[in-house]
Amino acid sequence: MSLCHIVRLDGYIQSSYLAVYPNKLMLLDGGCRPDVALVLGYIKNTLKRPISDLKVVVVTHMHPDHAGGAHKLRTATGCLIVSAAKETQWYSGVGGRVMHLVDIGLAHYVAKRQGRAITRLWYSAHLQPDLTVGDSDTIPQFDDWQVLETPGHTDRDLSLFHLPSRQVYTADLIIKLRHKFVAPFPIYDPKVYIQSLQKVKDLKPSNVMMAHGCELAIDAATFDKLIAQAPKHRRTIKDTIKHKLLWRQNDGFSLRKRKR
């Protein structure tokens, strides 16, 4: 059966997107831990459907607002977790464990800046997916959605392209601020990040769904500007902390005004 619509849910610190079909549902990203109740409540109370209709949760990458709810959603609904085919965990080793703690701390900071109530954000540093996918694969049970490997923010970022409508979910590839688009923090690999932007531009999507922002049509000129202004050097976790906590005059805005 064909897609009915895509619902944007106002998650804890990000937008979450739910693909609604007559007989099944797919969550385009795992969200934060507190988003589990939001998603299940929407399915039960707004859609008036059993939570078992949630068949797939995609995890585009391992940050707290994209992977934090995945395991709990699977426990509650029996859904499949689908993620990138990587041999190693993003948060591997001692350094990875430290980075996991830092990322959770940064998520708490963003939540505070957005005026969100303090809540638990802890989730496993290691994802245990049911299925893994690569570039050009389709999502199991949802073959109208094509997987795009769009790394750069991390080493395993996925985007999801709905083939019939040409809508694309890009997770953290592009961040929408009030009046402009910017690159995310961190940037794991600037070169492949630019290639990922070009890949999405070349699709000529009808609509771009962003985890930080909303869904918008982005024209070729805007993509070209994003590519031209993309970081030329890595943005490390140290840079990310500075960006969150300090005044970044070279970005042209104050974090006091920033809503992510």
Per-segment meaning from a language model:
Residues P34-V36, K44-L131, A228, K232-T236:
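Active-site HxH/HxHxD metal-binding segment of metal-dependent hydrolases
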Residues Y42, G69, Y193-K199, L226-Q229:
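A general structural detector for well-ordered alpha-helical segments in enzyme core domains, enriched
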Residues K232, T236-R260:
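C-terminal regulatory/interaction regions
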Residues C32-P34, Y123-S124, T138, D144-T222:
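Metallo-beta-lactamase
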Residues A19, S136-Q141:
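Short acidic-hydrophobic surface loop/beta-edge motif
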Residues M1-L47, S159-L173:
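Conserved beta-strand hairpin/beta-sheet module of binuclear metal-dependent hydrolase folds
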Residues S15-L18, K55, Y193:
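A structural signal for the main folded, soluble domain(s) of proteins
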Residues M26-L28, V58, I81, Q167-Y169, ...:
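Residue-level marker for buried hydrophobic side chains located in beta-strands
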